[in-house]
């Protein structure tokens, strides 16, 4: 039983699951998609055995296996008058136009931390329940947003007039990790699963 957060599930699982079924037909994986907050709570209460999420995030006492690093990109309308450079500095982000996922999603916190501008927390609009929704809002010129590189690589911008550029910040990355309860007797299974996830 594994929880996966929504800013990872649609971009990593389609590549990973077919290969896992082929190579490990004996492994029965029951998946559920939850926000980071709910997924960690499910792990703590024994509703799931492991969680695929993005760090940093408060997880309590857990063991973890590193999967990958994932950069953050700034997404904006193609005809944005500011014509953002190849690497977008946080100072160029208009916090009044910044659209983020609502509370409970760790990507919101990662985006705010990467910008290192405390005033953004009050000004940014926490509205989206999915990255696809945020992209559609940007495509309709309602603001700009932050996207993980894995979403951009998976084609989330296809069919839109939205472009994405890397955020120029030392904190503009998140760690994709598999976590499980400390002292779990299934540690070897989780490490094997992490190895399969790293192979992507």
Feature map (PLM): residue ranges:
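A late-sequence structural motif
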Residues: 12, 162-200
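Flexible hinge/capping segments at coil-to-helix
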Residues: 59-98
């Amino acid at each position: 039983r594994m929880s996966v957060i929504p800013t990872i599930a649609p971009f990593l699982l389609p590549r990973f699951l077919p290969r896992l079924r082929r190579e490990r037909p004996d492994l029965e994986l029951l998946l559920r998609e939850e926000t980071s907050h709910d997924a960690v709570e499910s792990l703590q209460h024994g509703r799931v055995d492991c969680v695929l999420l993005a760090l940093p995030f408060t997880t309590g006492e857990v063991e973890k296996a590193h999967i990958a690093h994932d950069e953050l990109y700034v997404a904006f309308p193609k005809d944005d008058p500011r014509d953002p450079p190849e690497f977008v500095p946080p100072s160029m982000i208009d916090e009044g136009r910044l659209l983020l996922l609502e509370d409970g999603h760790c990507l919101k916190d990662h985006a705010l931390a990467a910008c290192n501008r405390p005033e953004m927390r009050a000004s940014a609009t926490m509205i989206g329940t999915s990255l696809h929704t945020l992209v559609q809002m940007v495509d309709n010129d309602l603001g700009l947003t932050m996207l993980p590189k894995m979403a951009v690589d998976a084609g989330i911008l296809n069919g839109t007039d939205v472009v994405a550029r890397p955020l120029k910040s030392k904190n503009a990355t998140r760690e994709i990790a598999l976590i499980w309860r400390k002292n779990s007797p299934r540690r070897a299974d989780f490490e094997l699963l992490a190895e399969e996830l790293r192979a992507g």
